[in-house]
A protein has these predicted regions:
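Macromolecular interaction modules
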Residues: 1-114
């Protein structure tokens, strides 16, 4: 969640111009992808999203993720990240999850329909 005193535009601008760079610094040796997804309203009847950004980091394997987390847990990294996050996030409301992905092969589904 963004800090309440920031507009959505200010939040996104800071994230993409400053905080993203820190993410890249610590993630680039280990991660395959570093993605930020910002919610948009999809029209009439759309719910207001309960978050300001969904950040995804893709790793080749669990060991790569552990290596990235170790780099980001180092004292200097923690200090640098925390200082920047205070400019951007309501840190008490930030949530993190590790998930397992299941992907459908839609090309195979299409071939089954023929």
């Amino acid at each position: 969640f963004k800090r309440p005193d920031l507009s959505a535009e200010e939040f996104r601008d800071y994230y993409e111009s400053r905080h993203r760079v820190l993410g890249e610094k610590y993630l680039s040796p280990h991660a395959l992808k570093y993605i930020r997804r910002y919610p948009i309203l999809a029209g009439d009847g759309a719910d207001t999203p309960g978050f300001d950004v969904m950040m995804e980091v893709w790793f080749d394997n669990y060991y790569s993720m552990e290596a990235a987390m170790a780099d980001m847990s180092a004292e200097d990294a923690q200090r640098e990240l925390a200082k920047d996050e205070e400019q951007l996030f309501d840190r008490d409301r930030t949530q993190s999850f590790i998930v397992d992905e299941c992907e459908s092969d839609l090309d195979a589904e299409e071939n089954d329909r023929d």
